[in-house]
């Protein structure tokens, strides 16, 4: 180690002495003598780039730092990350090392590779002194690192309060708090407030708000309220709402904070947050007084008496748009309901800051053209600052100053409209536009939400003009509080300026604002307030001047303040707002409240003067606790001249409406009072002109798309339209107009829409059948207001609310999914439904002529009945991401479990699965226009023919029919897959996958992998001879058999649905390949039983290497997936009419037993490829028994070389024999020291035995003529060949000498094909080179053996025949197989005798079957042991 390295090590170890010794200069004389004048390199850097000074700074050792700096160490040397000693000193956070390094001249603003300057590190770690020192050395706190964060951002993110205070007190504070350009679109854009809110640092949020940060500052994810709500920070949400954040702001995904909480959080905290946000954004809550259901209107809200409806906005025709939240399911239903339906029960989120907005109170004079209809009005309280803002910030709806009050909610705009709709006929000649309509500048009363729901606005209690004196009022407050033992709060009330009359209008939030913070106390006081019966104390007449008015309300002390600030005129005072009171110094909450109540009263009096000539009685709201009032219009008087001016209109906060809004609301009146047009939904009434002509009009441009109204009436002539209204206001029927393209809807709340048909009486556009529908690009274009709306209707549900894409394409009427919320949701489905509608491809059938769907706002997803025209019964459209089908895990319910009606169709809205795997159903036929989405489509199971699959050109062909049934070619055009009408359900096939349905390759793969883990299909049982396979008469065949086996569990689902804790593999009846080889090219292949029975998950193999490419009949075309290379080529020349009679057995899947061994050769099923894990093993299904009866028993075992089997003599089938399902008898046991356990008969036609040489392992015993099922090519060392087949589990008697040391070697011996072997190499040496060569078969294994071998596949690489997993494994297996040997020997002997006797009787067959069943059970246990050992 050189001196430099020694120095670095010494400094690292803080060895000052060694460092000094290394750094001291050698004496000149000594240096000359030694010839070493070379000085040590003090800047030497180790492999990480650390110099000695880096280590010293990081350790904070001032002595070493001084020593190194004296030795001329470079002070700004960088390590591999660009960090300098100053960075490490700042990170470490000690003042003295920092001073030394700064004194040495280190630069404070040079960033590291990550963009950090030392101030970033000091701020992030909360080192106050170091941060202060860096600021004093002119460190720039506005520098951002690579992730766009300033030191203030980091301090806020990590909760470093002291550093935040320090940075905010610096002269760069304003620059630090300014929003950076591009924050709203930059995915990394953030702000100190967002970071503090996200991490729940309340103290820092307070500091930031005090420093003047914009509370409504937005990034891509929304405001700080979005961040706090998403992260479940309840206290932060409360603080932000109290501080006046706008709860209606939408992020770039068009979500409010409440939307985010509804979608993404389920914790207890989120419930509180939901309530807080609901209160902050609630427009009005109404309790329904009666049931309401209009099944003919898609947009109506079905209401039951007692439902609490949150009112969102008003439709131009007078109906209210409301939302009912279902606390049980967490869903919202949104729709329209008549305004007369209920009574208002506003649980008002009152002024937490002690202030409330001056919301308009409607008067009785809302216009001659309006019918006497109740309009329930919300008066939204103010909670300080920008507490509740309209979604789009109404122009002119804000007060002055940094804390300008937004229009309270959506209800604000609708009320501003309703209450300000005055036609010219309403206005007298003396009206001045400078005076607001009565009530629009008033103050919302603040009663708590209790009793007196029935009182209406018109009841007038007696009044007392003079308020009590200050002393008396204080005493009265104390006595009142003492009465219910809460006198400790008397100072709070008195210091805030509250007297009893003002207390009678307090809300719980007002109580919080004055310091009543305990919920129990607050509730008690609120209850007592509701019991106060204080007569109305506000002046009944408009006094002559301001002084008189102030003395009448007991606030004469503010006369000078008001006059000094320009409110000397009594008429000016009606324009005052909460912000103005704060600004001019009226800060006592009680006085503010009293003053604003009196201002509202004064505005009402002024409005009453305007309305005198109308003759309508002035109704005034009595002091009750509930916000209940009905705005009733008097009968219309004689129309007044059209040139009368309308009074000036204001919003809820008493600020004037914008010019456009004024114009929009008063403009239609110029047309004259006689232009009346009946409303679409109501009989013609005199109100039509104002209610419709002065429809939302100009205010629409200030409305975001979440508030789209279903405008049915004609818009005002000069009303500028916002996008939302252009789509939502249509001008009556226009039968010839083609439907315009639907624009992408912005999805608002996650809601559940009641499914109701359209309103009959409404003039709707009829879509002619030939109307052009949307075409694939479907570029949403901005449409004109006049064109009819083809958005959703009886033939197409509106799209579900997808929160993922800001502007998903709307589906055409026939293709739109139903709302995800409409499906009963299992626990695995309960996540948010992500639906990403893609552009529709292909043709869309013309909609049935009839009333066009009413315009549906995209914030109101609807469920509609399926179109009858474009979907055949039982062919529900399915969506699939890649047109595959996955195995459903056992936790994912099928359609029956979802209880979705079979007619729920074209398809139910798909949901992003919460379960372990996506269960993707293959799309139904003709799905050129399927909207792909990452989804799982629920499939109705019990109706109609199966869904035709998609056309895929590359699919391998397989037959889905039994040999004795003709191939139905009725649906060739439906895709590659003519699914049979008698396909089984999953419960019938017990977890088998329907190869006759599209995408089954994926399912096969999933199933095969399941078999290696413990899932799997159930065995097949044979019915009595001659009976075709019983199939459940499922009227809905397309719903066949997803794999019910759990991906991770060991249980398989039995036929009855019970969990069978036994492994089952995919073996099933297998047929002889010999017949295949002997068949001529002209004979067509018959489907193997695997296809229909569902137990064989493999695709039939295509033509093998040496075979003629002769195709069979039209086979069920299995849809290939690009993701699976596990395609099985069909054996081309398979025979046709072989009957495979399959049943399901609980223990072993065995080959069909033939009554006569002499039966002709049987056609083999398609070659099976078993995929377990990565190893791919192609297994040839064992022969049913192919071979003439005359064949002698096999000779003693010889050991021929492992050659290709082409040289074996072909055995022609006897021509005259009928082809019956032959039972392959168990072949005679070879002469061996230890017999091989055999399960079922093996092909015995050939006398030649071909041993299978395994690389590095003894040859495995092989059946006579059985081809080596594995390519003899040794597996590549890195890949573990998956042993799929244990010889112990070979269902055929294997004979052949084996050098295996003991039978224990044989059971685990696996005929595994290495993963590297391409599919075409299936069993390459065993493959007959030509159709004439006899193909020999590896018999299928019993399920347990397969499972065991599959489980063994997880073991480390082993030779294909399955090297023993260990001595213990061998020992166990020896014991077990020894036990089985004798039984097997007896069975083989008996079978050999029976074979010689010719046809066996059924009794013999049964006895043999039961014996084999028992042996199968033993093998199950053996497989269990092997499995346990291998795992």
From Swiss-Prot:
Cellular location(s): Cytoplasm
One biological process term in Gene Ontology: signal transduction
Location of Phosphothreonine modifications: 737, 1065, 1266
Domain SAM intervals: 472-535, 541-605
MF terms (GO), sorted A to Z: identical protein binding
Residues in SH3 domain copies: 281-347
ANK repeat feature ranges: 48-77, 81-110, 114-143, 147-176, 188-217, 220-249
SUPFAM superfamilies: Ankyrin repeat (SSF48403), SAM/Pointed domain (SSF47769), SH3-domain (SSF50044)
Keywords for this protein: ANK repeat, Cytoplasm, Methylation, Phosphoprotein, Repeat, SH3 domain
Region called Disordered, residue ranges: 348-373, 387-406, 421-447, 630-977, 1014-1039, 1072-1377, 1390-1416
InterPro entries: ANKS1/Caskin, Ankyrin_rpt, Ankyrin_rpt-contain_sf, Caskin1-CID, Caskin1/2_SAM_1, Caskin1/2_SAM_2, Caskin1_SH3, Caskin_C
Compositional bias of kind Basic and acidic residues: 1390-1404
Biased segments, Polar residues type: 772-786
Primary location class: cytoplasm
Positions bearing Phosphoserine: 358, 423, 432, 633, 646, 719, 724, 787, 889, 891, 987, 1067, 1257, 1364
Biased composition range(s): Pro residues: 848-858, 1026-1035, 1189-1215, 1266-1281
Modified-residue entries (Omega-N-methylarginine), positions: 398
Ranges annotated as biased composition (Low complexity): 357-368, 798-808, 952-963, 1282-1297, 1343-1355
CASK-binding: annotated segments: 375-469
A cellular component term, taken from the record's GO annotations: glutamatergic synapse
PANTHER family: ANKYRIN REPEAT AND STERILE ALPHA MOTIF DOMAIN-CONTAINING PROTEIN 1 (PTHR24174), CASKIN-1 (PTHR24174:SF11)
Purpose: May link the scaffolding protein CASK to downstream intracellular effectors.
Protein name: Caskin-1
Organism: Homo sapiens (Human)
């Amino acid at each position: 180690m050189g001196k430099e390295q020694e120095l670095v090590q010494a400094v690292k170890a803080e060895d000052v002495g060694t460092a000094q010794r290394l750094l001291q200069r050698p004496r000149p004389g000594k240096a000359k003598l030694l010839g070493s004048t070379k000085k040590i390199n003090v800047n030497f850097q180790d492999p990480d780039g650390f110099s000695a000074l880096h280590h010293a700074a990081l350790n904070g050792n001032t002595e070493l730092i001084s020593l190194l700096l004296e030795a001329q160490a470079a002070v700004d040397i960088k390590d591999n990350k660009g960090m300098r000693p100053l960075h490490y000193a700042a990170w470490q956070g000690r003042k003295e090392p920092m001073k030394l390094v700064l004194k040495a001249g280190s630069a404070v603003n040079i960033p590291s590779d990550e963009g950090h300057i030392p101030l970033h590190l000091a701020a992030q770690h909360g080192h106050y002194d170091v941060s202060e020192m860096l600021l004093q050395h002119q460190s720039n706190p506005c520098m951002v690192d690579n992730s766009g964060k300033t030191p203030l951002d980091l301090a806020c993110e990590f909760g470093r309060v002291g550093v935040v205070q320090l940075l905010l007190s610096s002269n760069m504070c304003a620059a630090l708090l300014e929003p950076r350009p591009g924050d709203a679109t930059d995915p990394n854009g953030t702000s100190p407030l967002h970071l503090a809110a996200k991490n729940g640092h309340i103290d820092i949020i307070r500091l930031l708000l005090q420093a003047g940060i914009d509370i409504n500052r937005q990034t891509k994810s929304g405001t700080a309220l979005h961040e706090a709500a998403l992260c479940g920070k309840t206290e932060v949400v409360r603080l932000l709402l109290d501080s006046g954040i706008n709860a209606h702001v939408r992020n770039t995904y068009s979500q409010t904070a409440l939307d985010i909480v509804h979608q993404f959080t389920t914790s207890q905290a989120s419930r509180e947050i939901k309530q807080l946000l609901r209160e902050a954004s609630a427009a009005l809550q109404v309790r329904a007084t009666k049931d309401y259901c209009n099944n003919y209107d898609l947009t109506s809200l079905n209401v039951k008496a007692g439902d609490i409806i949150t009112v969102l906005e008003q439709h131009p025709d007078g109906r209210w748009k409301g939302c009912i939240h279902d606390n049980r399911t967490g869903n919202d239903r949104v729709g329209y309901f008549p305004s007369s339906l209920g009574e208002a029960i506003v649980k008002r989120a009152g002024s937490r800051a002690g202030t409330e907005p001056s919301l308009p109170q409607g008067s009785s004079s809302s216009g001659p053209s309006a019918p006497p209809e109740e309009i329930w009005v919300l008066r939204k309280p103010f909670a300080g600052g920008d507490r509740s803002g309209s979604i789009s910030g109404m122009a002119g709806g804000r007060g002055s100053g940094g804390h300008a009050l937004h229009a309270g909610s959506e209800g604000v705009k609708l009320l501003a409209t309703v209450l300000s709709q005055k036609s010219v006929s309403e206005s007298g000649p003396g009206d001045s536009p400078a005076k607001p309509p009565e009530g629009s500048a008033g103050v919302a009363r603040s009663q708590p939400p209790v009793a007196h729901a029935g009182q209406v606005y018109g009841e007038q209690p007696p009044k007392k003009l003079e308020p009590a004196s200050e002393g008396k009022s204080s005493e009265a407050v104390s006595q009142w509080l003492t009465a219910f033992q809460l006198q400790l709060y008397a100072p709070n009330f008195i210091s805030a300026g509250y007297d009893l009359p003002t207390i009678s209008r307090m809300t719980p939030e007002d109580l919080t604002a004055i310091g009543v913070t305990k919920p129990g106390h607050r509730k008690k006081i609120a209850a007592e307030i509701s019991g106060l019966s204080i007569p109305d104390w506000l002046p009944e007449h408009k006094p002559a001047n301001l002084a008189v008015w102030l003395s009448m309300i007991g606030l004469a002390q503010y006369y000078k303040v008001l006059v000094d600030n320009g409110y000397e005129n009594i008429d000016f005072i009606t324009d005052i707002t909460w912000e103005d009171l704060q600004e001019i110094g009226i800060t006592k909450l009680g006085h503010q409240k009293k003053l604003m109540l009196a201002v509202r009263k004064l505005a009402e009096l002024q409005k009453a003067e305007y309305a005198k000539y109308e003759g309508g009685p002035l109704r005034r709201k009595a002091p009750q606790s509930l916000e209940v009032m009905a705005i009733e219009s008097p009968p219309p008087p004689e129309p007044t001249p059209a040139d009368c001016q309308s009074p000036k209109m204001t919003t809820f906060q008493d600020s004037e409406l914008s010019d456009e809004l004024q114009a929009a609301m008063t403009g239609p009146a110029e047309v004259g009072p006689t232009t009346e047009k009946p409303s679409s939904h109501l009989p013609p009434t005199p109100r039509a002109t104002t209610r419709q002509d002065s429809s939302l009009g100009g205010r629409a441009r200030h409305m975001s798309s979440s508030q789209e109204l279903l405008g049915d009436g004609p818009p005002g002539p000069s009303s500028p339209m916002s996008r939302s209204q252009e789509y939502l206001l249509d001008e009556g029927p226009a039968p010839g107009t083609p439907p315009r393209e639907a624009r992408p809807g912005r999805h608002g709340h996650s809601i559940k829409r009641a499914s109701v048909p359209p309103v009959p009486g409404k003039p709707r556009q009829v879509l002619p059948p030939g109307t052009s529908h949307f075409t694939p690009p479907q570029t949403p274009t901005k449409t004109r207001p006049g064109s009819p709306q083809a958005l959703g209707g009886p033939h197409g549900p509106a799209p579900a609310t997808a929160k993922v894409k800001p502007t998903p394409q709307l589906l055409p009427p026939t293709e739109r999914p139903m709302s995800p919320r409409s499906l009963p949701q299992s626990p695995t489905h309960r996540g948010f439904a992500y639906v990403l509608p893609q552009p529709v491809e292909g043709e869309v059938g013309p909609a049935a002529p009839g009333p066009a769907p009413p315009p549906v706002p995209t914030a109101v997803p609807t469920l509609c009945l399926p179109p009858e025209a474009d979907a055949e019964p039982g062919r529900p459209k399915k969506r699939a991401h890649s047109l595959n089908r996955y195995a459903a895990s056992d936790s994912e319910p099928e359609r029956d479990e979802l209880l979705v009606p079979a007619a729920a169709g074209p398809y139910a809205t798909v949901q992003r699965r919460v379960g372990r795997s996506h269960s993707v159903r293959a799309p139904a036929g003709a799905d050129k226009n399927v909207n792909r989405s990452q989804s799982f489509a629920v499939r109705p199971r019990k109706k109609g023919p199966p869904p035709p699959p998609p056309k895929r050109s590359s699919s391998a062909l397989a037959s889905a029919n039994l040999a004795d049934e003709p191939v139905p070619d009725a649906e060739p055009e439906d895709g590659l897959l003519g699914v049979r009408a008698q396909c089984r359900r999953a419960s019938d096939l017990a977890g088998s996958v329907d190869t006759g349905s599209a995408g089954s390759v994926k399912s096969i793969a999933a199933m095969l992998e399941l078999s290696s883990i413990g899932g799997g299909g159930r065995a097949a049982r044979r019915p009595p001879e001659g009976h075709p396979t019983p199939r459940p008469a499922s009227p809905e065949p397309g719903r066949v058999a997803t794999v019910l086996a759990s991906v991770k569990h060991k249980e398989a689902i039995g036929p009855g649905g019970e969990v069978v804790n036994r492994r089952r593999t995919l073996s099933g009846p297998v047929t002889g390949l010999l017949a295949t080889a002997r068949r001529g090219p002209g004979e067509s292949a018959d489907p193997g039983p695997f296809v229909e029975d569902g137990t064989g998950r493999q695709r039939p193999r295509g033509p093998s290497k040496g075979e003629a490419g002769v195709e069979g009949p039209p086979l069920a075309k299995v849809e290939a997936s690009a993701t699976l290379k596990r395609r099985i080529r069909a054996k081309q020349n398979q025979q046709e009419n072989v009957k495979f009679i399959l049943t399901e057995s609980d223990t072993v899947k065995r080959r069909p037993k033939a009554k006569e061994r002499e039966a002709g050769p049987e056609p083999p099923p398609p070659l099976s490829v078993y995929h377990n894990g990565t190893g791919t093993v192609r297994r040839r299904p064992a022969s049913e028994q192919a071979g003439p009866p005359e064949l002698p028993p096999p000779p003693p075992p010889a050991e021929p070389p492992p050659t290709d089997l082409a040289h074996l003599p072909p055995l022609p089938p006897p021509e005259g024999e009928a082809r019956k399902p032959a039972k392959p008898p168990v072949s005679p046991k070879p002469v061996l020291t230890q017999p091989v356990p055999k399960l079922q008969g093996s092909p015995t036609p050939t006398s030649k035995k071909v041993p299978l040489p395994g690389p590095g392992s003894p040859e495995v015993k092989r059946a006579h003529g059985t081809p080596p099922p594995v390519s003899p090519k040794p597996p590549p060392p890195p890949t573990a060949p998956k042993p799929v087949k244990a010889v112990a589990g070979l269902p055929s008697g294997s004979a052949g000498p084996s050098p295996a040391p003991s039978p224990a070697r044989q059971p685990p011996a696996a005929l595994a094909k290495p993963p590297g072997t391409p599919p075409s190499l299936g069993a390459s040496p065993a493959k007959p080179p030509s159709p004439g060569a006899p193909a020999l078969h590896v018999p299928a294994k019993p399920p347990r053996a397969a499972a065991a071998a599959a489980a063994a596949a997880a073991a480390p690489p082993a030779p294909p025949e399955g090297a023993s997993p260990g001595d213990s494994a061998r020992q166990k297996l020896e014991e077990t197989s020894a036990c089985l040997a004798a039984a097997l020997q007896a069975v083989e002997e008996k079978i050999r005798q029976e074979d010689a006797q010719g046809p066996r009787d059924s009794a013999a067959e049964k006895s043999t079957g039961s014996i084999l069943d028992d042996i199968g059970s033993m093998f199950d246990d053996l497989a269990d042991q092997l499995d346990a050992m291998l795992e």
